[in-house]
Each structure stands twice: as C-alpha cells, then as structure tokens.
A protein has these predicted regions:
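Transcription-machinery-associated regions
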Residues: 1-65
C-alpha cells in the first residue's frame, strides 16, 4: 500500500523537525493543518526557514516515489 510506504518513509528518512513541519503543514497523523507562518511562530523560526524545511523534506520523499 503506497500510503503505508509513505508513512514509513516519513518516519525513517526525515529528521524530527522535517517530520513535524510536514505533519503540521499537511495535517498528517490527525494533526490540524497550519500555515507556514503559524508553524514558524510555533517553532520560533522564520517563515522562509519553514518553507526550506518543507521543500527539503518533500524532495527527500520524492526520491522514493
């Protein structure tokens, strides 16, 4: 199942921060969906840094699909 494989890759290939950003951004694991600005405020980092983390995480996952 592709969804199960994706979740396994999220857990095994991404850093804790990358996982958190994707979980918050896309509402994974029953999380609420947040904007990049909201995530940045929650983590105490800039919105542009959240964007870079998100992009990096998606690129890592793209290698497998």
């Amino acid at each position: 199942d592709v969804i199960k494989m994706l979740y396994r890759k999220v857990e095994s290939e991404l850093s804790p921060r990358e996982r958190l950003v994707l979980k918050m951004r896309y509402g994974l694991y029953n999380e609420e969906e947040y904007t990049q600005r909201e995530i940045a405020k929650h983590l105490g980092i800039s919105r542009s840094y959240v964007s870079r983390i998100e992009k990096s995480a998606i690129e890592k996952l793209r290698e497998y699909f």
